[in-house]
Amino acid sequence: MNKIERVKNALRGEEVDRPPFSFWYHFGLQHMPGSKHAEAEIDFFRAYDLDFLKVMNDYPFPLPRGLEAIETEEDWKSVEPISADDACWKPQLEALSMINEAIGNQALFIDTIFSPWTTARRLARGGNLTEARRRSPEALLSAMASIAESLASYAREVLARGASGIFLSLGAATDDVMTAEEYATWGRPFDLKVLEAVRDAPFNVLHIHGSRIHFDSLLDYPVSALNWSHFNTPPALGEGRSKSGKAVMGGINEATAAHLSAPEIADQVSNALNETGGRGLIIAPGCSVPTDTPERNLRAIRMALDRRTS
């Protein structure tokens, strides 16, 4: 079974020769041209013989002209939609095209998109939207609608560059930021705007970041797989698989990945297989692995899979 078949079967909950696996981290190349980013991603994919590539995307969303950060109601009102051919997307799209040319016939790849809320938070002065929600709710909602439209346009272009879907990262679907009821206003409509743009893609993943996540209220999102830090927040991996009926990506505790021994990593892989029966499972961390994770620990993931399924 080749990499593409293995991932597609896992997403459908069908039999696989072994569960596919992958992992990712922030390369810190957001100040480099897209070609350098692509080279790092391709080298990483080949070095660890991953079953698919989750492409990191750390290039910043542009601020309105003349602003260093968004702070006032008028600032939020100045946020307008950005088309897919805007220069701000160029480095990442160039990287995706190069990745497709290099590995597109061997494996699927998906691009990371941070949710409209997360994107807005990064634009705000101090990275905090609490004051904007309280003092300028209509202006913030309007800005988020523009951001969602921009990200939806970008997501469609991602597919045109050869990606099989997107990895939509939600940073506020957690009680640590807001309630599920509040997220229904401030997050959900804008998330769905982005996902609707790529609804027909075969490999869309929802990453629910943080602890105390709103898992149950997100189960109707149109994605093929779910990813969350199940070692640090409910539900457990097997429970999430049963509740959602979707494929799950997990098994590896990213918070401890840099410090575990190979036998401890093997235990995590075995536990994931036991919880899910190995169906509808992609072995992966619940979030990015630390950049100081030793090579031997990353290689131990594949070795554990091979031993368990041989």
Language-model segments: residues:
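Glycine-/small-residue-rich beta-strand-loop submotif within the FAD-binding core of flavoenzymes
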Residues: 69-83, 130-135
